């Protein structure tokens, strides 16, 4: 059992080292885009499925509530949290529309719309990001593997260089925490 634990921790460390080596400029760009948008009175919309839905909710909570700094709340919405909206849209239009319909209702030009997908190929995230692009939003993909179909439609892809879903999710939450820290410092220091 100890060997398996050490193997998992080594794997985590290797992915985090690759994130540092390969994604630092993209993470900085992501944070810069979000700071500029929030300074301009825009908001963050964020979505994903399964574990990525939980990460989307976590991201929005850190932006609306606080990350480390006592400060005013900032506008962010996780499109994954309202069960009435999700089930109504899913029932009436199908699961592929659950995020797209919310982007249609909530996204304004200049908002930052983030899709999380460990595969990079979630259809409902793709459709929502495509609409966000049409509406003049800034689109970011927190992705995994090779970035899938999403990397080609977002303004900025931040693709964790791993094919292992747990490691990708760990990369995503680390990136989210770094971005939250940079947003607070960029807006309030």
From Swiss-Prot:
Amino acids binding Zn(2+): 58, 62, 169, 177
Superkingdom, natural source: Bacteria
Record's cofactor remark: Binds 1 zinc ion per subunit.
GO annotation (BP), single: carbohydrate metabolic process
Catalytic reaction list: 2 D-sedoheptulose 7-phosphate = D-glycero-alpha-D-manno-heptose 7-phosphate + D-glycero-beta-D-manno-heptose 7-phosphate
InterPro entries: GmhA/DiaA, Phosphoheptose_Isoase, SIS_dom, SIS_dom_sf, SIS_GmhA/DiaA_subfam
Annotated EC: 5.3.1.28
Cofactor needs: Zn(2+)
Residues binding substrate, per UniProt: 49-51, 62, 91-92, 117-119, 122, 169
Subcellular localization: Cytoplasm
Residues covered by the SIS domain: 34-189
GO molecular function: carbohydrate derivative binding; D-sedoheptulose 7-phosphate isomerase activity; zinc ion binding
Predominant cellular place of this UniProt entry's protein: cytoplasm
Listed CDD domains: SIS_GmhA
Keywords: Carbohydrate metabolism, Cytoplasm, Isomerase, Metal-binding, Zinc
Pathway membership: Carbohydrate biosynthesis; D-glycero-D-manno-heptose 7-phosphate biosynthesis; D-glycero-alpha-D-manno-heptose 7-phosphate and D-glycero-beta-D-manno-heptose 7-phosphate from sedoheptulose 7-phosphate: step 1/1
GO cellular component: cytoplasm
Subunit structure: Homotetramer.
Family listed: Belongs to the SIS family. GmhA subfamily.
Protein role: Catalyzes the isomerization of sedoheptulose 7-phosphate in D-glycero-D-manno-heptose 7-phosphate.
PANTHER family (alphabetical): DNAA INITIATOR-ASSOCIATING PROTEIN DIAA, SEDOHEPTULOSE 7-PHOSPHATE ISOMERASE / DNAA INITIATOR-ASSOCIATING FACTOR FOR REPLICATION INITIATION
Note: The reaction produces a racemic mixture of D-glycero-alpha-D-manno-heptose 7-phosphate and D-glycero-beta-D-manno-heptose 7-phosphate.
Protein name per its UniProtKB record: Phosphoheptose isomerase
Gene: gmhA
């Amino acid at each position: 059992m100890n060997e398996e634990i050490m193997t998992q921790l080594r794997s985590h460390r290797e992915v985090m080292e690759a994130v540092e080596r390969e994604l630092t400029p993209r993470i900085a760009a992501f944070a810069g885009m979000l700071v500029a948008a929030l300074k301009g009175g825009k908001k963050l919309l964020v979505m994903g499925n399964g574990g990525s839905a939980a990460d989307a909710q976590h991201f929005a909570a850190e932006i609306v509530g606080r990350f480390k700094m006592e400060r005013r709340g900032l506008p962010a919405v996780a499109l994954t949290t309202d069960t009435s909206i999700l089930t109504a849209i899913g029932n009436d239009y199908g699961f592929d529309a659950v995020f797209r319909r919310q982007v249609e209702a909530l996204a304004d030009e200049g908002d930052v719309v983030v899709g999380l997908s460990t595969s990079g190929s979630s259809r409902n995230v793709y459709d929502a990001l495509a609409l966000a692009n049409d509406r003049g939003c800034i689109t970011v993909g927190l992705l995994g593997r090779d970035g899938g179909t999403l990397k080609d439609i977002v303004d900025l892809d931040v693709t964790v260089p791993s094919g292992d879903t747990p490691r990708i999710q760990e990369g995503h939450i680390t990136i989210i925490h770094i971005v939250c820290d940079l947003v607070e410092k960029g807006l309030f220091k």
